[in-house]
């Protein structure tokens, strides 16, 4: 699992510990997880963007992958826009998954893979889209980057989140007694910064917001 995390990006870190074989390809499972994450995130973001109104159907129809799915679903005569949206997303997920499976199986056959060692020594990632699907997915990702991730409301929320995290870190690092006792107990052996980072990393969005209010809003009970 750790090796898969280290090799999450196509270009592995050459400084990675030797036990993670930095010069070799990750396992098929790790390669597959990279694509599964991407498929899930892309389509979740399509749904979120349309639901929030930050992007419109008319805008995203400029993306070939979405347009093909939307045309097929719309031809069924469904009147409910919410149902149409959900079925379009499911259609895109299905198309990406099938394309990834077909291309990967072809790559495995071409590379004559019979063992994990064959995967590691293939010299390339064997879990991959064919060039046509890769281009379609890239077009979708470029659209989401330009129209959703850089939407002014998203940028504002991202900046707000950074301020909250900085405030929390400064508060805990400045006065460690504000940390729960079990986290305070780790400080002598691990250091205040490591402990604070771990504590904040384990927070949900809601918990972080509540903690920020408790620490900085004098009207909120601690």
Give the ranges of each region predicted by the language model.
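Histidine-centered, transition-metal-coordinating active-site segments
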Residues: 1-222
């Amino acid at each position: 699992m750790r090796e898969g995390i280290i090799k999450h990006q196509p270009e592995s870190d050459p400084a990675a510990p030797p036990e993670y074989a930095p010069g070799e390809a990750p396992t098929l499972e790790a390669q597959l997880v990279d694509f599964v994450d991407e498929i899930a995130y892309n389509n979740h973001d399509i749904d979120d963007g349309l639901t929030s109104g930050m992007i419109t159907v008319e805008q995203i129809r400029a993306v070939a992958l979405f347009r093909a799915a939307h045309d097929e679903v719309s031809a069924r005569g469904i009147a409910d826009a919410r149902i149409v949206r959900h079925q379009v997303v499911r259609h895109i997920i299905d198309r990406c998954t099938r394309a990834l499976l077909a291309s990967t199986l072809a790559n495995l056959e071409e590379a004559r893979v019979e063992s994990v060692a064959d995967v590691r020594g293939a010299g390339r990632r064997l879990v991959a889209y064919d060039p046509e699907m890769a281009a379609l997915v890239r077009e979708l990702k470029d659209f989401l980057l330009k129209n959703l991730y850089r939407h002014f409301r998203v940028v504002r929320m991202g900046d707000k989140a950074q301020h909250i995290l900085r405030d929390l870190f400064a508060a805990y690092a400045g006065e460690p007694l504000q940390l729960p006792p079990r986290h305070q107990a780790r400080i002598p052996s691990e250091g205040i910064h490591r402990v604070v980072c771990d504590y904040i990393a384990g927070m949900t969005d809601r918990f972080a917001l509540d903690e920020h209010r408790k620490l900085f809003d004098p009207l909120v009970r601690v």
